[in-house]
C-alpha cells in the first residue's frame, strides 16, 4: 500500500502509480477524519456527562438547602 521499491525497507513516493497515491491519500484522509470525529464525539459525550453530574449535584445541594431552611 505504501508503494515499496525493490528493498523491503525503502519507500520511494516516485515509484507509486497515480492510483496508489490516490488510495494512500484517501486512506490517510479517512483515518484522520475518523480520528478527529471520534475525539469531538468523545469530548461532547464527556462534556454532556460532566454537565449532567454537575447539575445533579447543584440540584441536590439546592434541594437540601431548601429542606433545611424549611425545617429550620
From Swiss-Prot:
An example Gene Ontology CC term for this record: membrane
Tell me where it resides: Membrane
Major subcellular location class: membrane
The regions listed as transmembrane in this protein's record are 23-45
- Print the keywords alphabetically: Membrane, Transmembrane, Transmembrane helix
Question: What membrane topology is given?
Answer: Single-pass membrane protein
Going by the entry's taxonomy, the superkingdom of the source organism is recorded as Eukaryota
Q: Tell me the protein's name.
A: Putative uncharacterized protein C806.11
Organism for this UniProt entry: Schizosaccharomyces pombe (strain 972 / ATCC 24843)
Amino acid at each position: 500500500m505504501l508503494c515499496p521499491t525493490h528493498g523491503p525497507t525503502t519507500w520511494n513516493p516516485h515509484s507509486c502509480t497515480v492510483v496508489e497515491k490516490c488510495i494512500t491519500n484517501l486512506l490517510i484522509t479517512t483515518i484522520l477524519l475518523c480520528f478527529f470525529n471520534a475525539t469531538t464525539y468523545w469530548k461532547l459525550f464527556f462534556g454532556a456527562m460532566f454537565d449532567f453530574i454537575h447539575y445533579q449535584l447543584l440540584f441536590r445541594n439546592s434541594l437540601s438547602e431548601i429542606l433545611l431552611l424549611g425545617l429550620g
